[in-house]
UniProtKB/Swiss-Prot annotation:
Region Disordered, annotated ranges: 40-60, 180-223
Alphabetized UniProt keyword annotations: Activator, Cytokinin signaling pathway, Cytoplasm, DNA-binding, Ethylene signaling pathway, Nucleus, Transcription, Transcription regulation
Biased composition (Basic residues): 195-207
Name of this protein: Ethylene-responsive transcription factor CRF2
Function, as annotated: Component of the cytokinin signaling pathway involved in cotyledons, leaves, and embryos development. Probably acts as a transcriptional activator. Binds to the GCC-box pathogenesis-related promoter element. May be involved in the regulation of gene expression by stress factors and by components of stress signal transduction pathways.
GO molecular function: DNA-binding transcription factor activity; identical protein binding; transcription cis-regulatory region binding
GO biological process: cotyledon development; cytokinin-activated signaling pathway; ethylene-activated signaling pathway; root development
Induction info: By cytokinins.
Gene name of the encoded protein: CRF2
Subcellular compartments: Cytoplasm; Nucleus
Pfam families assigned: AP2
GO CC terms in record: cytoplasm; nucleus
Species, as recorded: Arabidopsis thaliana
Length: 343
């Protein structure tokens, strides 16, 4: 029985074959929709080739698989140009819808890329949702984020960040705007005003030194010329004039107190200023050269010298007419002061 059931109920293979055709009908000009005419035929005992009945029966029982074919023929009834125009409109509408969908999906991406790529990004600067630009920096020592404030533009916030970075991390810090070496040197260079003040102070000290040295020279010249004016010695005047002119060329200005330079000017006069021979030497113009020895030597008062000597004091040429007391009294009058002038 089981064998018979298997032979009666074999397996079935179903296939469908479809064909599409279009035809133009003039009667459908008023309608804008296309009509479809579908024709279908099913062959339950389909074979690949034709044969006798016996062979078919034999194959039906012998074959393990049954084959069924379905043929479908679809005919599209169109109304010519109207139908084609409507189809073109439908296709154009579909294309427009597709284009709108593609634009709606692509446009936000494009706008986002333009906003992000069009604007320049700065270090330590971020934009708030309401449009302001915030600047902040991290302190490497405290390990804390420092708030620098909000600004209207990104450039202002970037400049504030650069200043804070230079203060915290030095001139080698990473900044948004590159710093040229000229500006760096200008920032590091000291201000010129203190130098000018120092120069002015040095000039003032030099002027004070030269003034003090000139005053000291004038006072020294006055002190040196006072005995010459009293004794009326031309040799002494020439000597002191040469001395007063020579130290002027030898003065060296130094940035030291004025007392040191004054002491240096007086260092040339370490030797005694006046000797007995220079002060009381009357060989220049007053006393003739034939005295030969010292002014107050032993040969001064010899008999030969006294006979021929005459000083212009109307004493006479002889030794008897020369009174020693009267002569020295006149010398004392030279060093004294007139009583009338003193009053």
């Amino acid at each position: 029985m089981e064998a018979e059931k298997k032979m009666v109920l074999p397996r079935i293979k179903f296939t469908e074959h479809k064909t599409n055709t279009t035809t133009i009908v003039s009667e459908l000009t008023n309608t804008h929709q296309t009509r479809i005419l579908r024709i279908s035929v099913t062959d339950p005992d389909a074979t690949d080739s034709s044969s006798d009945d016996e062979e078919e029966e034999h194959q039906r029982f012998v074959s393990k698989r049954r084959r069924v074919k379905k043929f479908v023929n679809e005919v599209y009834l169109d109304s010519g140009a109207v139908v084609t125009g409507s189809c073109g409109q439908m296709e154009s509408k579909k294309r427009q819808k597709r284009a709108v969908k593609s634009e709606s999906t692509v446009s936000p991406v494009v706008s986002a890329t333009t906003t992000t790529t069009g604007e320049k990004k700065f270090r330590g600067v971020r934009q708030r949702p309401w449009g302001k630009w915030a600047a902040e920096i991290r302190d490497p020592l405290k390990r804390v984020r420092l708030w620098l404030g909000t600004y209207n533009t990104a450039e202002e916030a970037a400049m504030v960040y650069d200043n804070a970075a230079i203060q915290l991390r030095g001139p080698d810090a990473l900044t948004n705007f590159s710093v040229t070496p000229t500006t760096a040197t200008e920032k590091k260079a000291p201000p010129p005003s203190p130098v000018k003040k120092k120069k002015k102070k040095n000039n003032k000290s030099k002027k004070s030194v030269t003034a003090s040295s000139s005053i000291s020279r004038s006072s020294s010249n006055d002190c040196l010329c006072s005995p010459v004016s009293v004794l009326r010695s031309p040799f002494a005047v020439d000597e002191f004039s040469g001395i007063s002119s020579s130290p002027v060329a030898a003065v060296v200005v130094k940035e030291e107190p004025s007392m040191t330079t004054v002491s240096e000017t007086f260092s040339d006069f370490s030797a005694p200023l006046f000797s007995d021979d220079d002060v009381f030497d009357f060989r220049s113009s007053v006393v003739p050269d034939y005295l030969g020895g010292d002014l107050f030597g032993e040969d001064l008062f010899t008999a030969d010298m006294c006979t021929d000597m005459n000083f212009g004091f109307d004493f006479g040429s002889g030794l008897s007419s020369w009174h020693m007391e009267d002569h020295f009294q006149d010398i004392g009058d030279l060093f004294g002061s007139d009583p009338l002038l003193a009053v």
